[in-house]
Amino acid sequence: MSSTLLEQTRSNHEEVERLERLVVEDLQKEPPSSKDRLVQGHRVRHMIESIMLTTEKLVETYEDKDGAWDDEIAALGGQTATGTNVFSEFYDRLKEIREYHKRHPSGRLVDANEDYEARLKEEPIIAFSGEEGNGRYLDLHDMYNQYINSKFGERVEYSAYLDVFSQPEKIPRKLKLSRQYMKYMEALLEYLVYFFQRTEPLQDLDRILSKVCSDFEEQYADGIVEGLDNELIPSQHTVIDLDYYSTVEELVDVGPEKLKEALGALGLKVGGTPQQRAERLFLTKHTPLEKLDKKHFARPPHNGKQNGDAKSTHESENAKEIALTEAKVKKLCNLLDETIERTKQNIVKKQSLTYEEMEGEREGEEANTELESDDEDGLIYNPLKLPIGWDGKPIPYWLYKLHGLGQEFKCEICGNYSYWGRRAFERHFKEWRHQHGMRCLGIPNTKNFNEITSIEEAKELWKRIQERQGVNKWRPELEEEYEDREGNIYNKKTYSDLQRQGLI
C-alpha cells in the first residue's frame, strides 16, 4: 500500500526472513521418494532465487546511488524547502493513505502466511524424456548419432559409447580441430549442463564451471593442459627428415598419409598419387621453399609468413576453446558418475528384454514410484501383483519374469500349499513341510518322489517300489518262526544255524 522507500525496504527484509524460514522448514521434511526429493530441491531452489533477487534490491537501496534514501530520511524528519515541519509531513502521509483506500474500497487483504504456505505445496514441473526415467538415466542418443556419423567417431554400440563419451582425450588431436567436433562438444556440454540443473537443483553449477575455467587458465599458462599442444603447426624437420632419403622411390615407401601430412605442414599441395606427392616433397630437399614454383603450393606463397602466423593463432584459439569445453564435460561426467554407471546397467538390461518385458518393467517402475510417494499408513500400490521384496516393496518386473514367479505350483502332500516359481517348487521337496507330509503318509522322502505332489500318485509309486523290491513276497527263511524249549523265538534260518552248531 505504502510506496515509501523505507516501507519497501522493511517489506523486503521481512520477505527474506520468511523465505529463509520456509527453506529451513522444507528441508527438515524427509521426502518419501526420489521424485519428491527432486521436487523439493527445485522448490527450494526457486525460494533461494527469490531471496537473491530481493537481496539485490536491498543492496541497491543501501548503496543509494540516486540519493533517494537520504531524501527519504530527510522527509521523515519533516525537513522541507521552507523548514522543518514534522506535523505537516505526518498529515501529508495520512492523506495519502486515506486517498488510497478511497480509490480501492474493496481491496482484499492478502495474508502473507497463505502465500508462503502455498509455496511449500508448490510442485515445480520438471521435464524429463522417457529415456531419462525421471532423472535416473542419461539420454545421449542424439550425441551418439553425431558421434558415429562423424570423422572423429567410431561405429560402436550405444552401450560402448557410454564408456568413451566422457574420455575426449582418446580422440586423435588432428581430428579435433574441426567445426564438426566443436559443435558436437558444445551440444554434449549443453545437454550435460541442462541435465545437471534438472537433477541437482541445489548445486551451484556456475561456481563449479567457474572453478574449472580458472584451473584451466592456470594449466594453459603453464603448458600442462592434457591433449593440447601450444605449437599447432609441426616443423618440417619433425615430420620427415629428407636427409635419410636419396631417391623419390625411397620416399614413396613412407606411405601416402605421412607424405600428405609432411606436404600440408610445408603449405604444399597434398593431392595426387603417392609418386607425385613424393616428387613434390623431394623438391624441398635441395630447394628452399621461397624458390619453389608457385604451382606446388596449396596457397600463394605471397605473404605466406603472415598468413601462416594468422592461421596458427586462429587454430591455437580454437584448440584452447575445444580443450576448455572438454575440461567442463569431464568435470560434469565426474559429478554424474553414478548416473552414467546406472545408465550403462539399464542399457545392458534392456538388451536382454523383449518389448513386452520392457513395457512391464516400465509399468513396474511407475508402480514403485507411486508406491514410494504413498503415505506410511497407505495401502501398497501393486497393480501387477508382484511379490514383495525384503525392503517391503514389489520386486522389479524383470526379476519377476526371470525366475518365472508368475507360475503357480500346488502340492497336495503339503496341504495344497502354493509355490510360486520353478525354483521355489523344486526346493520345497527338501523342506520341512513336504517332509512332514511324507512321514504322515508313511513313505520315505527319497529322490524317487521328487516332482510327486499328489497323495494318490505317491502311494501308488511306493506300492510299485515295494513290489519291485519283493517286500510283499513270502520268505519262509526270514518270516517263518521257531521256538526252543526255553521259549525263545527265532526265524527259520537262525534256528537251523543254532541247531547245526548243537546249541539248541
Swiss-Prot record:
Feature: compositional bias, Acidic residues: 356-374
Domain of life: Eukaryota
Tissue specificity comment: Expressed at moderate levels in all sporophytic tissues with strongest expression in gametophytes.
Pfam families: SDE2_2C, SF3A3, SF3a60_bindingd, SF3a60_Prp9_C
Residue pairs linked by disulfide bridges in the UniProt entry: none
Keyword Cytoplasm belongs to the record: no
GO cellular component: spliceosomal complex
Main location: nucleus
Compartments in which it is found: Nucleus
Keywords assigned: Acetylation, Metal-binding, mRNA processing, mRNA splicing, Nucleus, Phosphoprotein, Spliceosome, Zinc, Zinc-finger
Stretches for region Disordered: 293-319, 355-374
Gene Ontology molecular functions: RNA binding; zinc ion binding
Any one biological process term the GO annotation gives: mRNA splicing, via spliceosome
Function: Splicing factor homolog to SF3a60 that may be involved in pre-spliceosome formation. Is necessary for gametic cell fate determination.
Protein name according to UniProt: Splicing factor SF3a60 homolog
Lineage: Eukaryota, Viridiplantae, Streptophyta, Embryophyta, Tracheophyta
